[in-house]
């Protein structure tokens, strides 16, 4: 199926429209690439543990499993690790259908959730899942130098934390800048509101501390692409937080950070068009 995207439904904040033309070309190329790989075969693998079997936490052993969607008969393919949303309190691993049938692998991890764990356990689990992918994807035919990371909502927050605070992936022997690109969709850039909830702080009171992506802004050695829903339909200040992060990162000397505001889509609805754009970016 060919994706038809009307330019008026996508707002991209850039300093020139050359990049918007690139976006439209990427979507057109995606239509072609989907046709080329439509006949490829894929296999789905379920509930692979990405932590040690002798981990002392029974809940971690229970929760820290991932599913994989892998091209068969291909070598050197790209892989995206995709983190589900759910406010760090709910949700489950999902092999997003919008990312499928494009010649890439999808790794979809679960991670521990509040209230059975607390910050920073969520982010440490996310880092462990990405590190497992980097270290093991070659066993399935993938290229470990072509690993991407993305996620929606809480998954977007985790994506941002892994991109900006290098210590999480470093704990597992992976350089955050070795990831090819990060694609957070509607992620909070202040400290996540569930982490505020742990501390009995109001949902509406923004906190920027070491658990805020903003607080960890740095000069990046890889790509970061931001996606949000329509500023009038998104969760409170979600678009504005991401726009501010873009400004902070560029102020630190990063090459322009793209941000896509997807007009007409609310917080839940934005994940589908964002995933299609991500797939287009990965396969261009």
Q: Each predicted region: which residue ranges?
A:
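Primarily recognizes the serine-hydrolase "nucleophile elbow" in alpha/beta-hydrolase
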Residues: 134-197
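Short beta-strand element of the alpha/beta-hydrolase
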Residues: 76-85
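Alpha/beta-hydrolase active-site loop
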Residues: 117-138
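N-terminal cap/lid segment of alpha/beta-hydrolase-fold proteins
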Residues: 39-74
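C-terminal catalytic histidine-bearing segment of alpha/beta-hydrolase fold enzymes
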Residues: 227, 243, 250-284
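Short amphipathic alpha-helix adjacent to the substrate-entry channel of hydrolases
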Residues: 92-109
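Mobile cap/lid helix-loop segments that gate and shape the active-site cleft of serine hydrolases
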Residues: 184-216
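Active-site-adjacent alpha-helix of alpha/beta-hydrolase-fold enzymes
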Residues: 100, 199-209, 228-258
């Amino acid at each position: 199926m060919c994706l038809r995207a009307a330019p008026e439904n996508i707002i991209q904040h850039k300093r020139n429209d050359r990049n918007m033309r690139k976006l439209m070309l990427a979507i057109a190329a995606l239509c072609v690439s989907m046709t080329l790989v439509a006949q490829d075969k894929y296999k789905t693998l379920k509930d692979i543990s990405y932590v040690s079997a002798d981990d002392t936490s029974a809940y971690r052993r229970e929760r820290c499993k991932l599913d994989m969607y892998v091209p068969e008969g291909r070598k050197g393919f790209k892989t995206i690790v995709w983190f589900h949303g759910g406010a760090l309190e709910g949700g489950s691993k999902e092999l997003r259908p919008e990312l499928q049938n494009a010649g890439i692998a999808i790794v979809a991890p679960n991670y521990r959730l509040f209230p059975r764990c607390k910050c920073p356990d969520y982010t440490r689990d996310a880092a462990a899942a990405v590190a497992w992918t980097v270290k093991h994807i070659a066993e399935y035919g993938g290229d470990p130098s072509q690993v991407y990371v993305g996620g929606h909502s809480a998954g977007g927050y985790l994506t941002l934390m892994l991109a900006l605070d290098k210590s999480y992936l470093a704990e597992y022997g992976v350089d955050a800048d070795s990831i090819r690109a990060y694609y957070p969709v509607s992620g909070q850039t202040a400290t996540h509101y569930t982490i505020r909830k742990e501390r009995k702080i109001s949902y509406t009171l923004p906190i920027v501390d070491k658990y805020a992506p903003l607080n960890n802004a740095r000069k990046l050695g890889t790509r970061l692409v931001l996606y949000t829903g329509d500023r009038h339909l998104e969760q409170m200040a979600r678009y504005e937080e991401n726009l501010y992060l873009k400004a902070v990162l560029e102020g630190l000397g990063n090459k322009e950070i793209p941000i896509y505001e997807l007009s007409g889509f609310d917080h839940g609805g934005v994940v589908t068009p964002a995933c299609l754009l991500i797939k287009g970016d990965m396969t261009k």
